[in-house]
Design a protein with these regions (language model features):
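Charge-rich, well-structured scaffold segments of protease-associated domains
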Residues: 5, 10, 21, 65-217, ...
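Short solvent-exposed loop/turn micro-motifs enriched in small/polar/acidic residues
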Residues: 1-3, 225-228
Length: 276
């Protein structure tokens, strides 16, 4: 996809603001992406980034949990968040005239999270139930096992949600330390697409996000071991078997990715594909 109206600004404190103007829509999608995910965790705190994401909507020093939702939903908008291996994103979708409201709420949940002990313990229970649901889904669990075998003894090989044991043992202090280390301006990208003027977006970001220069964020670098032939079998008393196999390939920007996309269509792209 070609970004015809793509603009980017880096503020003095390192925070990056990116936008693309799309004149065919009247809404905007706005995301605050913190470049910290499960890949930045140690084995001991696996699942912390995801748990922290859950805590974002439990209340801030300015808003209750209900107010966070109401301030967006009363405008016909939607607010949510997700965690990946390399980043955590807090996002909203709403009409373009409510850009300031969106920036205000997202800035609040990212910067002013209360992290109350009782909320943390409550969300641990929620996350543990999510993990149980994944463990009850063969199609989900084989993907976790596949990644584990593909990246053994590496953060990429660990589940984003963590495990029952690691999530249960995470302390508030560990969450605070993780936040202090990674939730810094130079480690945050604010992106918007839709009917949004870049200059206006930058203005609102400067208004609601801290302009202080925080600690320079340092990420740990983990080296991949060569791929070896490995397998894992998980037996469950169900009638249907689920099989997944694969290997690591070239980087995502390699020109051969186009050939791989074509191969994907040939093998599994429809009723006439080879593997159907």
């Amino acid at each position: 996809m070609v970004l015809n109206n793509y603009k980017q600004t880096r503020l003095d404190n390192g925070l990056r603001v990116v936008s693309e103007y799309v004149d065919s829509v009247y809404s905007i999608s706005l995301g605050v992406c913190v470049l910290a995910g499960s890949n930045d965790e140690t084995e001991e705190i696996n699942g912390l980034a995801h748990l922290l994401e859950h805590m974002a909507f439990k209340g801030t020093s300015n808003r209750s949990a209900l107010q966070i939702a109401t301030d967006i939903e009363s405008l016909g908008g939607y607010v949510n968040a997700f965690t990946s291996k390399t980043y955590t994103c807090y996002y909203t979708r709403l009409m373009s005239e409510y850009l300031e409201d969106g920036v205000d709420v997202l800035a609040d949940v990212v910067q002013n999270n209360l992290l109350r002990e009782e909320d943390i313990e409550r969300e641990k229970t929620v996350v543990k139930e999510e993990i149980k649901d994944s463990e009850d889904s063969p199609s989900s669990i084989i993907h976790d096992y596949f990644i584990e075998q593909l990246f053994p003894n590496h953060p990429y090989g660990r589940p984003i949600q963590g495990t029952q044991e690691t999530v249960g043992s995470i302390s508030r202090q560990q969450i605070v330390e993780f936040t202090d280390k990674y939730y810094n301006p130079d480690n945050i990208v604010i992106a918007a697409a839709g009917r949004v003027k870049h200059e206006e977006l930058v203005e609102q970001v400067q208004k609601y996000f801290s302009q202080e220069i925080g600690t320079q964020t340092e990420h740990s670098h983990h080296h991949f071991k060569p791929v070896e032939k490995r397998k894992k079998v998980y037996k469950k008393p169900i009638k249907q078997s689920h099989v997944l196999m694969g290997t690591r390939i070239f980087p995502r920007k390699d020109d051969r990715r186009f050939e791989l996309s074509l191969l994907n269509v040939l093998l599994s792209g429809g009723l006439s594909s080879r593997l159907f």
